[in-house]
UniProtKB/Swiss-Prot annotation:
Protein name: Cytochrome b6-f complex subunit 6
GO cellular component: chloroplast thylakoid membrane; cytochrome b6f complex
Domain of life: Eukaryota
Sequence intervals crossing the membrane: 17-37
Gene (name only): petL
Cysteine pairs bridged by disulfides in the record: none
Amino acid sequence: MIFDFNYIHIFMLTITSYVGLLIGALVFTLGIYLGLLKVVKLI
């Protein structure tokens, strides 16, 4: 079997970017949630 390193590189890059977006979305959601909690505590 001959491995196509270019294909593997693109595959890894896609997975990395997908995981990065997923983590970014989680951090963004947590940031909004914590922000709302602070606002509720202030009121």
